[in-house]
């Protein structure tokens, strides 16, 4: 193919390489030997060779000169059917593309289902040059939805190769964002497969459906995980993008104005703001399969804290079905920590409670500590070990560490107070055992009473047996 000399076979989608390697498109080299075998070089053949070389080296002035001669047309096809415009697009030479289009080149030309727009989107070059080429072709009515033989559209190639602005321009020009190729891949799937986080965010913003599966039943998130792009896996699996589809309702001009910017700082700010928008409410609802309730709750300014304290009548008020309520209530039951009424401790401090009540208090306190330990263990398990895998925007780590230090101090104070309580109880127990005037426990009194009852019963039985013997003796006499 025409691009073979620069980057190997320029197979964008439908254009497979040929069996022959002699296509005459070597950069900086013309096959003069083959011409000599023909006996002599004809002027027209010489001009064609010069034209090929000019396209290869990007010599715009020579291309214009040869086109002006009238011997060569912009729609002439070289070996394997490529036109000059297709070759210029394959090397992302925007200036050559402009010259050829101004000369009347057909922007909608295709060869074996490979369009010029597909060739431009899969070109090797800077994104700036590729973007200019694509913009020129779209301005000449190139169709952004024509697919190659593998059913891949231009947006899939742009997403695969990491060209964020090209993806956005194609969508603004009418490209279908959720089209699937022969393997069921969408543009989002290709971006997830290649690890292009910025394109994943942009596609979600443009309305990409992250739940579309491939032919083998894989979601984009699973494709990302399989290729070890764990940050994208987390982004697609555990969060819901609040900007999803936000740009779909804008006009083409408004969309281009919003998405085509070369300011890297603005682009980075957008990426981080998109990440920061993911919150604990979305994560909680996604874990329960209730993503559809996110927008409704956000519209009513309901936070996760509010959700966790809602009553059943409030769930009904906000449109939760009985099945949704059961899911949330079951989750709340697992998270529930039995509350201790610490306001009653003043009574306990005066020892105006029974032993059973005091024991119940200690059991509740122990249970609550167990819940807290489990909660911390779960957090440790869920936190990523690599900072690159953190999707949500976090505050300064110093804030977290300072709170953890306070927690450690509080736990140490609690441990000290519990030890003091234990020592006090042990001291009271020892003093009671050594006090000769202490009242026996209820269990001890009941044991003593049972012994008296047993002895009385034996005495009565013995006396009755004696009367029975005397009666029999008296009757015999």
Swiss-Prot record:
Repeat positions for ANK: 46-76, 80-109, 112-146, 150-179, 183-212, 216-245
SUPFAM superfamilies tied to this protein: Ankyrin repeat, Pseudo ankyrin repeat-like
Pfam families, per the entry: Ank (PF00023), Ank_2 (PF12796), SAM_2 (PF07647)
Residue positions, PTM Phosphoserine: 17-18, 20
Location(s) in or outside the cell: Cytoplasm
Gene Ontology biological process: cell differentiation; male meiotic nuclear division; regulatory ncRNA-mediated gene silencing; spermatogenesis; transposable element silencing
Limits of the SAM domain: 274-336
GO CC, any one term: pi-body
Keyword Phosphoprotein set for record: yes
UniProt entry keywords in alphabetical sequence: ANK repeat, Cytoplasm, Developmental protein, Differentiation, Meiosis, Phosphoprotein, Repeat, RNA-mediated gene silencing, Spermatogenesis
Stretch list, region Disordered: 1-23
Classification via InterPro entries: Ankyrin_rpt, Ankyrin_rpt-contain_sf, Asz1_SAM, SAM, SAM/pointed_sf
Bridged cysteine pairs (disulfide): none
Gene3D superfamilies found in the cross-reference section: Ankyrin repeat-containing domain (1.25.40.20), Transcription Factor, Ets-1 (1.10.150.50)
Residue ranges crossing the lipid bilayer per the database entry: none
Principal location listed in the UniProt entry: cytoplasm
Record text on subunit structure and interactions: Interacts with DDX4, PIWIL1, RANBP9 and TDRD1.
PANTHER family associated with the record: ANKYRIN REPEAT, SAM AND BASIC LEUCINE ZIPPER DOMAIN-CONTAINING PROTEIN 1 (PTHR24157:SF3)
Known role: Plays a central role during spermatogenesis by repressing transposable elements and preventing their mobilization, which is essential for the germline integrity. Acts via the piRNA metabolic process, which mediates the repression of transposable elements during meiosis by forming complexes composed of piRNAs and Piwi proteins and governs the methylation and subsequent repression of transposons. Its association with pi-bodies suggests a participation in the primary piRNAs metabolic process.
Protein name according to UniProt: Ankyrin repeat, SAM and basic leucine zipper domain-containing protein 1
Organism for this UniProt entry: Aotus nancymaae
Top-level taxonomy: Eukaryota, Metazoa, Chordata, Craniata, Vertebrata
